[in-house]
Amino acid sequence: MTEFQTLRGMVDLLPMQTQRWQIVENLARHHFHRAGLKEIRTPLLEITELFARGIGEATDVVGKEMYTFLDRGDRSCTLRPEGTASVVRSVVQHGLLNQGPQRLWYGGPMFRYERPQAGRQRQFHQMGVEFFGLPSIHADAELISIAWDLLQDLGLKDLKLELNSLGTFEDRQNYHARLNEWLECNFKLLDKDSQDRIHKNPLRILDTKNQSTQELLKDAPLLTDYLSDLSKERFLCLQEALHKLKIPFDLNHNLVRGLDYYCHTAFEITSSQLGAQATVCGGGRYDRLVKQLGGPDTPSIGWAIGMERLIILLEDSIHKEQFVDVYFINRGELPAIEALSLTRKLRAFNIIVELDHSQANFSKQFKRANRSNAKWAIIMGEDEIAKGEIRLKRLTSSINGDGFDEICFRNSEFNELVHTLKN
């Protein structure tokens, strides 16, 4: 074992892994651009109170999972455990809401002190979308459709959209009273975690993963029975919009999400391939959060995708791209200088070139070239310099069937070389 290792739950992404990540990130950016979204980037570190107030003191995230410390100015700081609170803080701080509705996306690392397992790390990555100032139920439908279409375009087949309505704050207050009464009557039948949550965050009991408690909850009062007529109408309109968009969904009356700021729409996109960590994307509406964090009353909705879980699902379907177009083999002082000059010119034409600086014999350099997964090798030694030639050798089989394995270009035939490398 080497002297220095990554911390538990902190994972290095090595070059062959980052290729897969880049494919996903680039496709996501394309979807976001097509949907008229603008990127926002926020710091990894925020004042702890932002998350305590925004996410909720009684949540597991704030109570158990945050990386929190005092800085040298005795301020309590926290590595962001999720993206929404930071985006809201930024939107309020910089007055973006004065410019009208905002349609934003973000991406980057988040931190939670959880037990690491497949698809869940202590440093993890999310990409998310947030709409501000859009109260329409059709904004909810559009937001869900952006996530659904992205996951479909990535080739995921085993997906399920689960949908619920949490109603208004007043709806939930009425429901809390009835739910607490029922939970107290069944206290001894609940699992230990659920018993601990009764007085802290009873709604989270509905989202338990304990099977015996799940069975018990089938007889619990339903939140949907306590929704106001307006909340029920809103939820029906969302379902109709999703039917119109041909996005299939299941109603899950126990879906409450893990953060306190949600209201009305709550949803998750899951995959059975992920086992216990089934959620790929989750989100909902949070109309009170902006005001709660010092901004104006602003209807808002958003979602986040867990990148690690997404990559697990895509490992077999995302194929390795050609990472290098050309591996440049050279030996000798003058060939090395000429090789560097030619490499710069080729890169200016968006040709990916890896230049060998080893000055090893050609046999060893060819072995490296084959390992590089390059399509071509350029060979430049003293003979090529003397003849004024650039020698090109194919390292992979011909796609168009032209049949040549090796060809020489005169130094004056640079354009022909570029054309060959690009085709």
From Swiss-Prot:
Annotated compartments: Cytoplasm
GO CC annotation: cytoplasm
Keyword annotations of the record: Aminoacyl-tRNA synthetase, ATP-binding, Cytoplasm, Ligase, Nucleotide-binding, Protein biosynthesis
Claim: Lyase is one of the keywords in the record: no
Keyword hit for Manganese: no
Family: Belongs to the class-II aminoacyl-tRNA synthetase family.
Quaternary structure, from the entry: Homodimer.
Protein known as: Histidine--tRNA ligase
Native source species: Prochlorococcus marinus (strain MIT 9211)
